[in-house]
């Protein structure tokens, strides 16, 4: 439900927001980077989403309807995103769906994203941040993991609009062209993001 009971050896240190939400350390990194407090409603876990849906069902808030994983769990995710945006009076909302595309843990969040794009096609943009390894013994950047990530997203009904290609080195033009072609994007929508000394 929250990060307070997670094993820090497996999940990293617990970060507590100013309003008391126990979450993972990524939120602390985001707060430092943005130099802003991030309120509790900007963080959700699968457990907290499931718990909210179950509690509403127990309180008869679904009017006796059969409550199902789909669509009710993705609808709860969408409801929370919209509520957080409204409360913050946000011009836009940047949402990180953690994990790796294709993992079962994030499939319902991807379904929520797909449903949002379907409902608001001009207001939803998908950005895939993908790692392009450079095996030391070969010294050549590999694009296959990113190609498979895009295929997995496509299988979930999502086509990324932008790919941010993370790597130890900058991506060259031939690989950029290859990724654009094989991932159904224009070259300008494939962005190289090599490691740097400081992100500030």
Locate the predicted segments by residue.
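Flexible phosphate-sensing "switch/lid" loops adjacent to ATP/NTP-binding sites
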Residues: 1-200
């Amino acid at each position: 439900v929250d990060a307070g009971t997670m094993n820090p050896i497996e999940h990293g240190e617990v970060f507590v927001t100013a309003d008391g939400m126990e979450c993972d350390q990524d939120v602390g990194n985001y707060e430092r980077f943005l130099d802003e407090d991030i309120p509790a409603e900007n963080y959700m876990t699968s457990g907290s989403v499931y718990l909210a849906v179950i509690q509403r069902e127990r309180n008869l808030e679904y009017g006796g309807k059969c409550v199902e994983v789909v669509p009710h769990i993705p609808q709860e995710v969408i409801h929370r995103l919209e509520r957080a945006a409204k409360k913050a009076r946000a011009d836009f909302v940047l949402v990180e769906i953690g994990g790796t595309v294709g993992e079962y843990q994030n499939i319902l969040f991807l379904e929520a994203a797909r449903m949002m794009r379907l409902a608001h096609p001009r207001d939803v943009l998908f950005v895939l941040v993908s790692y392009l390894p450079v095996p030391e013994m070969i010294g050549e950047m590999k694009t296959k993991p990113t190609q498979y990530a895009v295929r997995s997203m496509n299988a979930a009904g999502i086509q990324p609009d932008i790919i941010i290609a993370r790597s130890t080195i900058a991506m060259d033009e031939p690989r950029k062209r290859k990724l654009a072609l094989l991932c159904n994007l224009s070259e300008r929508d494939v962005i190289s993001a090599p490691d740097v000394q400081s992100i500030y």
